[in-house]
Structures are given as structure tokens and as C-alpha cells.
UniProtKB/Swiss-Prot annotation:
InterPro entries: Carboh/pur_kinase_PfkB_CS, DKG_kinase_firmi, Myo_inos_IolC, Myo_inos_IolC-like_sf, PfkB_Carbo_kinase, PfkB_dom, Ribokinase-like. Its EC number is 2.7.1.92. Pathway: Polyol metabolism; myo-inositol degradation into acetyl-CoA; acetyl-CoA from myo-inositol: step 5/7. Belongs to the carbohydrate kinase PfkB family. It holds the Pfam family PfkB. Coiled coil: none annotated. It catalyses: 5-dehydro-2-deoxy-D-gluconate + ATP = 6-phospho-5-dehydro-2-deoxy-D-gluconate + ADP + H(+). This is 5-dehydro-2-deoxygluconokinase. Keywords: ATP-binding, Kinase, Nucleotide-binding, Transferase. Catalyzes the phosphorylation of 5-dehydro-2-deoxy-D-gluconate (2-deoxy-5-keto-D-gluconate or DKG) to 6-phospho-5-dehydro-2-deoxy-D-gluconate (DKGP). One of its GO terms (molecular function) is 5-dehydro-2-deoxygluconokinase activity. GO terms for biological process: inositol catabolic process.
Amino acid sequence: MNLLPFDEQKPLDFIAVGRLCIDLNANEIHRPMEETVTFTKYVGGSPANIAIGMARLGMKTGFIGRVADDQMGRFIVQYLKNNGIDTSHVITDKSGSVTGLAFTEIKSPTDCSILMYRDNVADLKLEPNDIHEDYIRQAKCLLISGTALAKSPSREAVFLALEYARRHGVVVFFDLDYRPYTWQSKEETAIYYNLAAEKCDVIIGTREEFDMMEQFAVHQHDDEKTAQKWFDYHAKIVVIKHGKDGSIAYTKTGETFVGTIFPANIVKTFGAGDSYAAGFIYGLMNGWPIPKAMEYGAAAASIVISSHSCSDAMPTLDQIEQFIQHIKAARPLQNHK
């Protein structure tokens, strides 16, 4: 049984909606932000990273979003174009908005934090009029992320995109991407996350993100109950990530899969979820068994957290396969030591 019936006749493989911003990653690692003086600039934002990851894997990819009318906005659009992503629905906002900035602090491989500047950002100016039914109709799948739900009019634009996707048989992925600093209250957050999740075919998030969505529910912190809740709506697959302990995928048909964990020379922890999503979605779109899709997602995540950047480090298919082969070849040698 094919859980996700992708329409192979559609010309676009993948469209992402939402956040386009700038990551400024600390060059001086192993020190606090107060002592960091230089940063390297990259394109950032979870949906942007996932779209870049999909394009690197050879998928025909498009993006729907807004960027600021400034140098940073132009940098983002050109970067997407350079990676073969269709930017015909990336709009330059003329309202005086700014590009969102994320400064990353890398104190140690496991102690990383992000300082966000999100006031009056262009990506949250996305309007329903920016969402075109004919464009979404052409895609096999659509990705939304939670940050775009944080404020109007972006919130309404996302729900319109969901409506068009459901109308035209477009498979919908929801990357939860919860960022508390963009929301006004826990009640608002839970309400809109739940309303969006009800319309999605695949939901991917951390245990903590699902806990946020379930904060008013009777049962919490139970992966199986979490998955079953969404199977009562449209969801076919729910993936719950547990950080260094790996991920678990549940299907509406009652299957459970525990994901592979790969070693990594960790530079920073952020970016793992975005690269995992790209590898996992790519596998599902190619009709792979869920465990194989999870394996490629985990391998992509290990590659990215071993790198300084997120978007620049999104791997190609060859890089993922070489990484997996290298790790599997090394394991027998380790077992004989």
C-alpha cells in the first residue's frame, strides 16, 4: 500500500512556503557571543534549508515567500537561483520590512544557541494574494513550517496554501520548526499548530515540539498517542525526533520504525532537523521503504552538523551515499578491535 500517492505527472517535485532569512554563524567557536567578533553569512530559515537540500538531491524545487527589499533579500534570492530553485513566487516586500537575522553561538559541539532578530521581518509579510492555486497545483508535494504561522498575514497565506494543496492532491509535509520568540502565547501557538497539522499528510518534529502542541491534552509525552491523534485526521506518517537518541516513525497502517543513528564530528547542533527532513522526504518521494528514507535523513543530518553552515552543507545524493558506505565499511573493523 502506497501511503503517499505522489502524482508523477506534475512538473514540480517540491514547493516550500515560509521563512527566508540570514544565518550569521560564529567563526570563533568555543566561546560565548560576547567574545565573538566575526561571523560567516549563509542563507537560513528551516523551509529554505529544506528546499536547498531537496534541490541538491536533484528535485525540481520551488519556493513561495517574501524577502526584504535590501541587499540581504537579494542575496537570498540569488542563492536560491544558484541552487536551481524556482524563485518566481519569491516576492520582494516593499513595506520597509527587514531580513530576519539569526546569530549563532557555538560554545561547544553540544552547547549552541541562536540569537534571533525577528521584528518587522519580510517573511511574515507573506499575504494570501501571494499564494497562487495554479502554482501549488503543479507540485507533487508542499512543505509548510510552523514559524510562518506565527503572525498574520503569513498565517492566513499558509492556510490558503494548505487548502489549495488538499484540493489538488498535493502531499503536504509539516516541519514543526517551533521558535518560541515569534509567538505571543502558548495558547495561540498550540491552537494554530494543531489547526495546520490537521491538514497535513506527514508531520515531522521533536518530542518537545509535539509536547508544545499537546500542552492542553490529557495525555502527554507518549509517542504512540501523539501519532494516533494525527492519524485521526489526514496524517499518514508521523516522525518524532529524540535528538541523539534518534527518531521514530509511525504510520497510519500501524507500523513503527526506529531510525538509524550515525556518528558525526559535531561542530554545532543546529541544521540537523532541516537536513534530516530533506533526506527523509527525498526517500519517500522516490518510493523507498520508510527505514531507508530515515537512514538517508540521518546521514544528511550527520553531514550537516559536522559542518560550519547549514544551507551550504546540505549534501548531494552522492555525498549521502558515500557517507553511509564509509560508516558501514568502518563498523566491521571497529567490531573486530
